[in-house]
Amino acid sequence: MIFREVLRPPIWVLAFIYFLFLSVVLSVWAAFDNQATLITLALSTMATVWIAHAMKSEITFDGHILRIDQANIEVQYLTNVRVLDKSEMRLLRTRDADPAAYLAIKFWEPQGVRIDLSDPRDKTPYWLITSKRGEEIAALLNR
């Protein structure tokens, strides 16, 4: 494995989700008994742990194949890799987005990488990837 990056949700996102669950727990406590409240609290805690796991994203590159979560592409189909700053990423996520593009973006991370593709079997023009280590990905893929 040449490159591996795991993007996990920040603690403030998980805390916000958990506080939403706690409002449900409080409502259950007001309407029912303590046993129902404890069950709801346990389920809410387990749901938050599951959500934290489900929200993570993994980028790997082994020298031949770039994998982002379930998507993968061979390096021979990559044409141009460009690191995007905060403002470029914001525009490409919204106004300038191509509906056919593959988006592997996380709202809590403002920077990323645009990877242009040239696969004749695939109409996807580019991948837009959220990454904290965009410079490193670009250096590896532009070789």
Model-found features: residue ranges?
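N-terminal membrane-targeting/pre-transmembrane regions
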Residues: 1-31
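Pocket-edge structural micro-motifs
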Residues: 5-7, 117, 131
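Short, well-ordered turn and helix-capping elements at secondary-structure junctions
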Residues: 7, 63-65, 119
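Alpha-helical transmembrane segments of integral membrane proteins
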Residues: 21, 41-44
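Short, aromatic-rich membrane-interface segments at the entry and exit
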Residues: 32-41
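Conserved beta-hairpin
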Residues: 43-82
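Non-transmembrane, membrane-adjacent beta-strand/coil modules in membrane-associated proteins
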Residues: 69-128
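C-terminal/domain-terminus segments
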Residues: 124-143
